[in-house]
Amino acid sequence: MTFTPTDYNAYDFANRRHIGPSPSEMEEMLRVVGVSSLDQLIEETVPASIRQDQPLDWAPLAEHELLQKMREVAAKNRVMVSLIGQGYYGTVTPPAIQRNILENPAWYTAYTPYQPEIAQGRLEALLNYQTMVADLTGLPVANASLLDEATAAAEAMTMAERASKSKARAFFVDADCHPQTIAVIRTRAEPLGIEVIVGHPAQLVPEDVFGALFQYPGTYGLVRDFTREIAALHEAKALAIVATDLLALCLLKEPGAMGADIAIGSSQRFGVPMGYGGPHAAFMSCRDELKRSMPGRLVGVSVDARGNKAYRLALQTREQHIRREKATSNVCTAQALLAVMASFYAVFHGPKGLRHIAERVHLNTVRLAQALKEAGARVSPEAFFDTITVEVGVGQAGILAAARHRGINLRKVGRDRVGISLDETTDAGVIARVLDAFGIHDPAPASVGLGFPEAMLRESAYLSHPVFDMNRAESEMMRYMRRLSDRDLALDRAMIPLGSCTMKLNAAAEMMPITWPEFATLHPFAPPEQAAGYTEAIRDLSDRLCRITGYDAMSMQPNSGAQGEYAGLLTILAYHRARGEGQRTICLIPMSAHGTNPASAQMAGMKVVVVKSAPNGDVDLDDFRDKAAAAGDRLAACMITYPSTHGVFEETVRDVCRITHEHGGQVYIDGANMNAMVGLVQPGAIGGDVSHLNLHKTFAIPHGGGGPGMGPIGVKAHLAPYLPGHPETGGPLAGGQIVATHEGPVSAAPYGSASILLISWAYCLMMGGEGLTQATRVAILNANYVAARLRGAYDVLFMGNRGRVAHECILDTRPFAEAGVTVDDIAKRLIDNGFHAPTMSWPVPGTLMVEPTESETKAEIDRFITALLAIREEIRAVEAGEIAAADSPLRHAPHTVEDLVADWDRNYPREQGCFPPGAFRVDKYWPPVGRVDNAWGDRNLVCICPPVESYSIAAQ
């Protein structure tokens, strides 16, 4: 017998692990689509005029090779004890939370909870987060997270401008705020025409401002009561914002007790590693009357069809995707996964545990301050929580170096001071090393008391809801987390076919490095030489993304796709100003654009001019040409999505770019649909000047149930000098390098949520250039297969000139309205089959947009198709008069276990209602609640944990 080695490669990650359909299954799918090969399908789908010539050519790494490379890169980072503070602190992530939340795909692969019936677990966890924030800040309403503390401060400023009755156009910022917060506020204020006044609170003139931001405790440690300043602001009809620290509020008087209108901050030190800048969940809370002006997601309590308590996203008409160019915020993806971690940290420790941690941190700081004072050092401030500043004169460099020699980073403050911020991880050994750096080797025992006046001690209770006390034992904590995750539908259970969302595989090997200490524990403002591994990773990822997109430089700072849009538009405006063309402020945006596009343009101070869509869904070229000509020398940019939001490669994209350039504008190509382009089309080569990339879509960062995300922007060379900079680095950042000194930051950290960039880097390395291209091709195949199978049962809207869709397709459900069947009915019925609904009513009302990513197997796609075909038959029964829509399984969906076991009095069989075609029988997903009453929830708004007795609430 002759031995013949197999040609099967067990380590081929792209084809064996990431891409779902096998080669033989692809052949079957191609036959259904009506082509002989994948090459033919791509030729019929992607216009030849835009296809790239040069292939992506780097070789792939196997999983074990990837992890070995990651270990080598991680070793180049130097793990130090960072006592820099400035909004970032060492913290202990309880292993129960790391293993059961952060490393659990049931939590990290879920989508934003727009379908509440299949998101009750994470909605409860986010409601716990809101309750935690509301309790600790002393304000009644809190949102479910924002991107970072600096962004939250900027959002609070614009919120105050909307809500304030003051006629002033200036905003006061306490000079004791974190420098990165001040910088981001300046960035946000400038295009909106808001004057930013930075000064000491004693310099505040309330009549001159519409609002003020105070830091509590201050960036240099000061704890002070702002009650008097806040009262003066209110007298002048202005609003008061307090940037605060949740751990400090376990001891200190809460902002609400001072009269604050809005509180913001970061929940990072509640168990979320620093990660060289993120991701972390920022928070915002406010007075009740301001809740409708609050940006971000807001979880509320409602009831389902049986009157059972149910959670949902409340007041959604506030959000940018609905308000579009009238929006005042573009917040979309936030930081849900990190908010969930922080909420479980509070559940894990409870109010007593949190107070103990806060006391320990504070008393250690008192001991350190006393030891320094007794040795003759000049320590400030007099009132502090965890941060002190030491005057060291000309010895500053020596002290900083001595501390680093002992494995500790201190903060450089001015030219003659050193800042020290202690945290949960600080122990006696760390304190001894700090003192040793100051030449204090045998400190006298210190008497320990409060480091701030007793009048500043918190008097009110917090976290009194039983959820923060009943899970003390880890066994109960583990079961609680499991119960919540079992209520949700994430990628670990089924495909999530959301159009324009790209819910692809988030491979375990890609996720592993983010929890390694060499990556997780780095402070974003640590000396650059301590982050050589991060620098290498960021530069290499930037280089690969530039090769993929055809751009020349990449900024990794934006913390979300929407923030990337905003940063890209600011870059364009800065370019125009530098050329003496500051009058260019008009932005042309197709009416089918993502809702964040017009919202981002409005935030950048642009005037949005909406361009019509042609009947086939393309940009109406005649209308575009006319509006570009009308704008003339006022045209700043156009924003288009490619492939279009209608899921088609438009043939006229080069014409749109050419017309824009002829009138002196810049072309912004939204990268939300980049999953249909990687390896096939480079936006920078077809006329784009700038694009953002949704790394949480195309490049495998998980959605986390509503964040984290990353939205880096790629630009052509002429725009590179105008990329976002940062006060800690001194200039715009491109691929880990400073390229010039021009624009301010859009995020708190220089590289945004740096730790999750590792996921996209790992994805690119394991896929290789050929694998990335094949993933794009298979994504297009999967979408065309779905369209071909469903055509006839559903009308498929918008196809290219040769009858092909890109990576997603739009199903028209509007004809069913005559029979009384809504798109919502179809979405809820899919839950009975164990599926998340496709994107509903966007970009066309009354439609479903389906995106089956390349990671989905043919079997799973067929199961989804079976479900939709069965639903179509149920619609036909309604159309034929066999059953009324109100009595059909469509209207009663989703069906719960409670429905299954109750007396059955419905006009269809129990089997049909609860076990429709396509649904698993043994491992069936059962939604924990029936259809949620959205209107009830908004009429009876409750955004904190309801009392225990209300858990049996019944609809009135």
Curated annotation (Swiss-Prot):
CDD domains: GDC-P (cd00613). Coiled coil: none annotated. One of its GO terms (cellular component) is glycine cleavage complex. GO terms for biological process: glycine decarboxylation via glycine cleavage system. It catalyses: N(6)-[(R)-lipoyl]-L-lysyl-[glycine-cleavage complex H protein] + glycine + H(+) = N(6)-[(R)-S(8)-aminomethyldihydrolipoyl]-L-lysyl-[glycine-cleavage complex H protein] + CO2. Its cofactor is pyridoxal 5'-phosphate. Transmembrane segments: none annotated. InterPro entries: GcvP, GDC-P_C, GDC-P_N, GDC_P, PyrdxlP-dep_Trfase, PyrdxlP-dep_Trfase_major, PyrdxlP-dep_Trfase_small. Keywords: Oxidoreductase, Pyridoxal phosphate. Its EC number is 1.4.4.2. It comes from the Bacteria. One of its GO terms (molecular function) is glycine binding. Pfam families: GcvP2_C, GDC-P. The modification N6-(pyridoxal phosphate)lysine is found at K697. HAMAP family: GcvP (MF_00711). The glycine cleavage system catalyzes the degradation of glycine. The P protein binds the alpha-amino group of glycine through its pyridoxal phosphate cofactor; CO(2) is released and the remaining methylamine moiety is then transferred to the lipoamide cofactor of the H protein. NCBIfam families: gcvP (TIGR00461), PRK00451.1 (NF001696), PRK04366.1 (NF003346). The glycine cleavage system is composed of four proteins: P, T, L and H. Belongs to the GcvP family. This is Glycine dehydrogenase (decarboxylating). It comes from Cereibacter sphaeroides (strain ATCC 17025 / ATH 2.4.3) (Rhodobacter sphaeroides). The lineage of its organism: Bacteria, Pseudomonadati, Pseudomonadota, Alphaproteobacteria, Rhodobacterales.
